[in-house]
Regions:
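Hydrophobic packing residues within well-ordered alpha-helices of enzyme cores
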Residues: 93, 170-173, 200, 221
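Conserved small-residue-rich beta-alpha loop and adjacent elements
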Residues: 109-184
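Conserved NAD(P)+-binding/catalytic subdomain of aldehyde/semialdehyde dehydrogenases
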Residues: 130, 180-227
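Active-site-adjacent beta-strand anchor residues
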Residues: 19, 134, 159-163, 190, ...
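N-terminal Rossmann-like NAD(P)+-binding subdomain of aldehyde/semialdehyde dehydrogenases
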Residues: 1-119
């Protein structure tokens, strides 16, 4: 199995070595996420999602310096910048909680035709399915929060592909989510090459793609999405 050395860009020291996942492993994760979403008995009620996100914010706040040091090491950034990044990530989680508390459907006006008299109609917001989040290297902690937390908040399983040079912050976030009560298949990291990623993007089980990166790559990935 091929391995990837995670380097500190500042001094080129090896921080850790992670194994590449093969195509079979990646698509097994996709299938688990898809089956999870299809099983309505396993949907997480809104109050549980809120509690999970609240505990996540508390955990990150308690160990903020550790996560800042980790992001700085794998990203090669000044520690001051990474500390700001972690603070922004915590704010991002709190914003998701606030939005979740106010997210609602709409009542549709009835009684304007004879057939709609004495009737009520409304819209209800529902999660759309499995989210694939392809992230970038420059803010490895906060960008994952921006992409994954909204998906989890509204009840969508999410697969996260971090930048190959900065996967450690992503792994830490996912471990924390599992630690505070999110079932494992709701949020999974995939660490694979671009060929496997391209096949994943075009799979019909992916309901939504969130991508952070160049315009060129973004439009290319968009063109590969399943109808």
């Amino acid at each position: 199995m091929e391995e990837v050395k995670i380097l500190n860009p500042f001094d080129q020291n090896v921080i850790e070595t992670l194994p590449f996942e093969d195509e079979k492993s990646v698509f097994m994760k996709l299938e688990r996420a898809h089956q999870l979403f299809q099983d309505h008995r396993k949907q997480l009620p809104k109050y549980e999602r809120i509690q999970i996100l609240e505990r996540l914010a508390e955990k990150i706040s308690a160990d903020a310096e550790y996560f800042a040091q980790e992001a700085a090491a794998e990203g090669g950034k000044p520690i001051a910048d990474s500390r700001i990044e972690i603070a922004r990530a915590i704010d991002g989680i709190k914003i998701a909680i606030r939005e979740l508390c106010t997210l609602k459907g709409e009542e549709i006006t009835m009684g304007i035709t004879a057939s709609s008299t004495n009737r009520m109609a409304m819209t209800i917001r529902q999660p759309r399915g499995v989210v694939l989040a392809i992230s970038a290297f420059n803010h490895p902690f906060n960008l994952i929060i921006h992409q994954a937390i909204p998906a989890i908040a509204v009840g969508c399983p999410v697969l996260i592909k971090p930048a190959l040079t900065t996967p450690l912050s992503c792994r830490s976030i996912i471990n924390l989510l599992h630690e505070v009560g999110l079932p494992k298949d709701w949020c999974q990291m995939i660490f694979c090459d671009n060929t496997v990623t391209g096949k994943l993007v075009s799979d019909s089980r992916v309901s939504f793609l969130t991508f952070i990166g160049s315009e060129k790559i973004g439009w290319m990935l968009r063109s590969q999405l399943a109808p």
